[in-house]
Amino acid sequence: MSATHETRRRGFVREILGRSDYAIISELIEPGSRVLDLGCGDGELLGWLAANKQVEGRGIEIDGPRVQRAIARGLTVYQGDIDAGLTDYPDGSFDYVILSQTLQETRRPLNVIQEMLRVGRHAIVTFPNYGHWSVRLSLLTSGRAPRTRCLPYSWFDSPNILSLIHI
């Protein structure tokens, strides 16, 4: 596949799903794979992978309304807290385990990553782009870390900071 074609395809996936990390993740996933999406939200990525890569997908999401929306899409999504571990899944249950822009929401990130590596052959972790120009501009003009759709917390009330307070 030519670089130009690949760039166009990635742009198309980004346009459809609205996030550049989804485009990159979709390139990494082999068709027909077994995929676990941790913190899957309403299943947008999982649904796209099922439709376009024919993956056998499952998701775990902590937010009840998002779980309901994912299930309404016909996806297999369970409500659960990934900080509690993935004890329901034996070693090597999945080809890919995805943690997309979710690690910063966890209270036990090392445990979450260890569990990903235990249940999956491959782990894919993405992060919000804290260096994006819009984030930098907001920081410059307001003097405060911005709150966005991908970064919904102030620095002092993020889950990892709050977990330190409750030690």
Protein language model annotation of sequence segments:
Residues 16-32:
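Conserved alpha-helix/loop element of class I SAM-dependent methyltransferases that forms part
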Residues 33-41, 125-148:
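Conserved class I S-adenosyl-L-methionine
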Residues 43-47:
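Glycine-rich SAM-binding Motif I of class I
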Residues 48-85:
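Class I SAM-dependent methyltransferase SAM/SAH-binding core
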Residues 96-107:
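A short SAM/SAH-binding and catalytic strip from SAM-dependent methyltransferases
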Residues 110-124:
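A short glycine-rich, Lys/Arg-flanked "PGG" loop and its adjoining helix->strand segment in the class I
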Residues 165-167:
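Conserved small/polar residues in nucleotide/adenosyl-binding loops
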